[in-house]
Design a protein with these regions (language model features):
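A generic structural signal for well-ordered alpha-helical segments
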Residues: 38, 110, 210-211, 252
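Active-site neighborhood of glycoside hydrolase catalytic domains
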Residues: 130-135, 141-241, 245-250
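Feature activates predominantly on carbohydrate-active enzymes
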Residues: 1-152, 161-163, 167-182
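Residues within well-ordered alpha-helices
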Residues: 34, 106, 206, 251-252
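A general structural signal for short secondary-structure junctions and capping/turn motifs
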Residues: 8, 109, 232-235, 252
């Protein structure tokens, strides 16, 4: 005889995990295994953090002859094939990266089992895999509250040509459909320590740019990175997904 009814359903619509494959390379086979295990446990969103660098750049500070560019010696990774290159050297890591074909297929395969893959390209900070190749686009200075930490992992978004350059990185994957129109694209936006006005203007521009074709996600930072004058456009934030990782950086 029936003794009751079990109703089993998730409490939250987005059940996510962020996997940093940038600072330490992770094979595609392992990524697939993680996605399958997540799906088994009713998780449905795997955010793949594709680029970053070792965070403690103050470890690369020379007491006798301090120079922000010393921090370029720190390890960085960019794990997705890219046509963006300088003098024949791509921003994609030579030691290990995924081809566009295999990553695009990974997105499609996971979608069939109810798992959304969210590729994250972290800009304008955490970007030394990019600035290490395009050093002329880096912020050459020190973190305001830490005079020993270099800012060379920051792209200098005070310059229009750098903002345009960043767009080309995303556009490549959108135009060749590595990221199709259903792919949520994460633009990073994490922990920018340089010019707050330039950061907020950049967020208005990059969010609106990506939203022309794709849903967009970003790390919360707009509460902390302020200049008391540059408003974030309603059309930039409407519908954008935010990783609320710290109330100090974004309070919702």
């Amino acid at each position: 005889m029936p003794r009751g009814e079990i109703r089993d359903y998730p409490k939250y619509a987005v059940r996510s995990f962020v996997f940093d494959v940038a600072r330490k390379a992770v094979s595609m086979d392992m990524l697939k295994d993680v996605a399958k295990n997540m799906a088994w446990y009713k998780m449905n969103d795997l955010q793949v953090h594709l680029n970053d660098n070792l965070i403690f750049l103050e470890d690369y500070y020379d007491e006798d002859d301090p120079d922000p560019t010393d921090a370029f010696a720190a390890y960085s990774g960019y794990r997705l094939e890219s046509d963006v290159a300088k003098d024949g050297t791509s921003i994609a890591s030579a030691d290990y990266h995924y081809t566009k074909e295999e990553f695009g297929s990974f997105i499609q395969e996971c979608r069939k089992m109810g798992m959304n893959i969210v590729p994250e390209i972290d800009v304008p900070a955490h970007a030394m895999a990019i600035t290490g190749i395009f050093r002329e686009y880096a912020v050459n200075g020190w973190t305001p509250n830490n005079s020993r930490r270099s800012l060379v992992d920051h792209l200098d978004v005070t310059r229009p040509e750098v903002v345009a350059f960043i767009k080309t990185i995303f556009d490549e994957y959108i135009e060749d459909r590595t990221f199709d129109e259903n792919t949520v694209i994460h633009v990073g936006a994490d922990e920018f320590m340089a010019d707050a006005t330039a950061y907020r203007e950049f967020m208005n521009e990059i969010l609106c740019h990506i939203k022309q074709t794709n849903p967009v996600r970003l790390w919360g930072g707009l509460t902390r990175i302020v200049d008391n004058k540059t408003e974030i456009l309603p059309e930039a934030v409407k519908g954008s997904q935010i990783n609320l990782w710290s109330k100090d950086w974004a309070d919702g």
